[in-house]
């Protein structure tokens, strides 16, 4: 009898439904890498060899994401209002920050970021969908291809010992 119950409980439909459960992404994540896959299949580092970043997601899906190239040079003047054009360029291209809400579609393996504020103003009040993969405490996703065909890929590791 127990075998029959187990068989009925784990039909393909039930297993498929279980696999579509929304994963719990709430918590703090640190950036493992922020790479870019070029159209020819080669891979590069989008934010330098040792990027740093933090992704925080609360239980309601509000998030804040920060990525920085750790090799960004300091401003010679020590004043962000008087930087040179080259200093401003490396600052903008060496960082990415946005916040808002996110939603997970487990069946489509997609995360939708509803961006409320961003270091790149063109992203504000937009929605961006990224294909994701969650393996234990490792979250990775692919950003839609840029105009030149490059595909940014980010991987995050959940910070241990969170409540």
What are these regions (language model features)?
Residues 7-163:
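Lipid interaction determinants
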Residues 1-3:
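Bacterial N-terminal signal peptides that target proteins for export
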């Amino acid at each position: 009898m127990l075998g029959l119950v187990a068989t009925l409980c784990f039909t393909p439909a039930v297993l498929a439904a279980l696999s579509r459960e929304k994963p719990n992404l709430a918590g703090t994540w640190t950036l493992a890498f922020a790479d870019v896959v070029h159209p020819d299949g080669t891979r590069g580092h989008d934010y330098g060899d040792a990027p740093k970043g933090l992704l925080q997601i609360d239980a309601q899906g509000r998030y804040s994401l920060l990525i920085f190239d750790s090799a960004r040079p300091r401003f010679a003047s020590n004043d962000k209002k008087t930087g040179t054009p080259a200093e401003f360029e490396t600052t903008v291209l060496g960082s990415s920050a946005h916040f808002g809400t996110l939603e997970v579609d487990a069946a489509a393996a997609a995360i939708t970021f509803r961006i409320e504020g961003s270091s790149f103003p063109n992203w504000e009040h937009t929605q961006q969908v990224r294909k994701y993969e969650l393996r234990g405490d490792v979250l990775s996703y692919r950003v839609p291809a840029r105009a030149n065909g490059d595909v940014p890929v980010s991987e995050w590791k959940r910070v241990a010992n969170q409540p």
